[in-house]
A protein has these predicted regions:
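Metalloprotease/metallohydrolase-associated module, dominated by Zn2+-dependent proteases
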Residues: 6-34, 62-196
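Membrane-interface helix-loop junction between the first two transmembrane segments
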Residues: 31-45
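Active-site recognition of the HExxH zinc-binding catalytic motif
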Residues: 42-58, 74
């Protein structure tokens, strides 16, 4: 359902988007309060994207990089994947269709939620308490991605500080994306009321 340049915006469409933005705000609030940053359904999809990222970056696991890109590839892909859709929705279509800034902001929110997930993973580097896919915690196994990354970079003792920065950026990005998503609907609401 698109609004056209000449036609009136569909009121139901506008209110559905407002409801979605409200839901995303609530899910973000819940994720930032949750110890694991979990968002129902989204977190499961993101785990698959994270694991795919490791495979995607395997060709870059050459000895020069010491496998760093394979390890980093999971988190990097998890955060970057939604940004592909941000770019897609912000591009003006060849057929002249308008950009969908609202959809782009929903995808930016998704990327921010993924960054929160990565921050939680990073913060666990030394503690090793998160449960991994193999059923063991990082402490019980040979560590996890962020333990290995930060150890290799000599930054392990800064895991929680780095994670706080990631979390802060994720929080600001969540708030900005939801605000921008709502902002895109204001002219449509105003136009809809004038036409009623």
């Amino acid at each position: 359902m698109r609004t056209t340049e000449n036609g009136p915006p569909r009121t139901l469409h506008i209110y559905a988007r407002l409801a979605l933005a409200t839901l995303l705000a609530w899910l973000a609030w819940r994720a930032f309060r949750d110890e694991l940053g979990s968002v129902p359904l989204v977190s499961d999809i993101d785990l698959g994207i994270h694991e795919f990222g490791h495979m995607l970056f395997m060709p870059f696991g050459i000895p020069i990089l010491g496998g760093t890109m394979v390890i980093l590839g999971g988190s990097l892909t998890q955060v970057m994947f939604p940004l592909i859709f941000v770019v897609y929705f912000l591009r003006k279509k060849e057929d002249g269709a308008r950009r969908d800034v609202f959809a782009a902001m929903v995808c930016l929110w998704w990327s921010a939620i993924n960054l929160l997930d990565v921050a939680i993973y990073c913060a666990d580097s030394r503690a090793g308490q998160l449960m991994l896919l193999n059923g063991l915690t990082g402490e019980e196994s040979d560590g996890h991605d962020w333990y290995n990354l930060l150890s290799g970079w000599g930054l392990l003792e800064h895991d929680t500080a780095i994670a706080r920065w990631m979390r802060g950026i994720a929080g600001l990005t969540c708030m900005a994306s939801i605000t921008a998503a709502l902002w895109t609907q204001l002219p449509l609401i105003s136009r809809s009321r004038r036409e009623d």
